[in-house]
Amino acid sequence: MKETIILEKVKVGDASAFSLLYDLYWLKVYNFARLYITSSSAISEVVQDVFVKLWESREFLDVTKNFDGFLFMITRNIIFNYSRRYFNELNFKMTVLKGLRIHMI
């Protein structure tokens, strides 16, 4: 099935077309995320989040524009959000450990 037809069906909420779109693109999203994230479980989480976001924003799909660009923009934003959460959590853990170290002395 042609990509524009799949996208038009996804846009109106066709779940089977979305499943087909997932099958066509999940590996591209996975490999793109792998460039920035090393944990395979985190990469899988990013892929899942990308497709959830895509489904939630399906009404904004413009079948005449570059779908790859749209998809990778979503992926990039989710990777940034993941990285921000990861580093904030890491920073918090480091702060707690420093606090514990001070109290142990």
Predicted regions and their residues:
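Residue-level preference for short helical/loop micro-motifs built around acidic side chains
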Residues: 19, 31, 41-44, 65, ...
